[in-house]
A protein has these predicted regions:
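Conserved beta-strand-loop-alpha-helix junction that forms the acyl-donor binding cleft
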Residues: 77, 103-114, 132-136
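Conserved beta-strand in the GNAT
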Residues: 41, 47-56, 66, 71
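Conserved GNAT-fold acetyl-CoA-binding loop/helix
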Residues: 7-29, 37
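Conserved GNAT acetyl-CoA-binding A-motif
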Residues: 86, 94-108
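Conserved acetyl-CoA-binding loop of GNAT-fold acetyltransferases
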Residues: 109, 118-127
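A short, well-structured alpha-helix characteristic of acyl/acetyltransferase catalytic modules
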Residues: 1-13, 140-141
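A conserved beta-turn-beta hairpin within the catalytic core of GNAT-like acetyltransferases
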Residues: 57-67, 77, 96-101, 125-126
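Conserved acetyl-CoA-binding loop-helix of GNAT-fold acetyltransferases
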Residues: 72, 78-91, 119
Length: 141
């Protein structure tokens, strides 16, 4: 299922993270729990080999699909599965009642996936910056 694929994809190179099935399931469930959530899955027989999930969000006068998670089974990477999934997503979004203008996502700089996304029509924003802050931050005192 999606959580199993998530663990396979993100616990290997280049991410080398340490997800458990339960953590992955919870993350996907959280993403998919809203009215604006969308999920897409590619199967090879009974096996999930690629998936994307995210949310359709309004930004001023247009909508965009923010892809929160996108993963392809490492054994299927480089075989066009991910590109076909993105093409499928674009076609599905064209069927939505409201026009969806953009696909958007965050990823790590200098990772192999950057060229994959660029080859599928994504480009890096020159103006946007993702920032994080620890909840326990107490200021510069």
């Amino acid at each position: 299922d999606m959580a199993t694929l998530f663990v396979k994809a993100f616990n290997t190179y280049p991410w080398n993270e340490e997800w458990t099935f339960e953590q992955a399931f919870t993350r996907i469930d959280e993403i998919m729990s809203a009215r604006v959530s969308r999920g897409y899955v590619v199967y090879d027989g009974d096996t999930v080999v690629a998936m994307a999930c995210g949310r359709i969000m309004t930004y001023i006068d247009f909508k965009e699909l923010w892809i929160d998670e996108f993963s392809v089974n490492p054994l299927y990477q480089g075989k066009g599965v991910g590109s076909k999934l993105i093409e499928f997503i674009r076609n599905e979004l064209k069927k939505e009642k409201s026009k969806i203008s953009y696909l958007a996502l965050n990823t790590e700089r200098d990772y192999p996936c950057v060229s994959f996304y660029e080859n599928n029509g994504f480009s890096a924003s020159e103006t946007n910056l993702v920032m994080f802050a620890n909840v326990d931050y107490k200021g510069n005192n």
